[in-house]
Amino acid sequence: MFTVLIPIQLICIILLSIPASAAEGALEKAKLGRVSWSSFQCATWADMSGNKKEHAPLFVVGLKAGREFINAVRSGQVTAKLAKQEAPIEVTTLLEGPSTDFLLGRIFQSAGLDAYDKIVKEENGILLEPSKWINDKELIKTKAQTRYLNGNCAALKEKVDRGGKSKTKSN
């Protein structure tokens, strides 16, 4: 009798842990929407600050994270509700289109424009009048460097350098 109970208990433990690990996996994949958005913004700030070598690795992080996020949403691994809870609204409103790469292009464009606007067209989150938009290249560079530093962009880059999930062959 004991020998029968042990395998049954083991099976029950395994079966009960599957939904939890699936939910954890879905949560991690849902968070990739934010990683993608942030990486694309950081790539833009790196570019604007004259740090061109940081642009490509951050772009790749955004591309890989975004692709995994979109594929998880499309396959149903991540529900629409979970995606809306974990990913920025700017990402979740752009999830309609013919292909994953099309959606990634839309997200990249939107994140880049948002990052640019935060440097050139906004002050403390408030949109400036067009006459007050910044056009001084050095000031733009300085503000972009500050955003890059304050936006934890180096942490995304370090993840790539340390061999994290987003490590690319070109690094």
Role assignments for model-derived ranges:
Residues 4-17:
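Bacterial N-terminal signal peptides
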Residues 67-171:
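Compact alpha-helical subdomains of small soluble proteins
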Residues 47-81:
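N-terminal, post-signal-peptide region of Sec/Tat-exported proteins
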Residues 23-54:
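Immediate post-signal-peptide N-terminus of mature secreted/exported proteins
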Residues 20-31, 126-133:
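Short amphipathic alpha-helical segments and their helix-coil junctions
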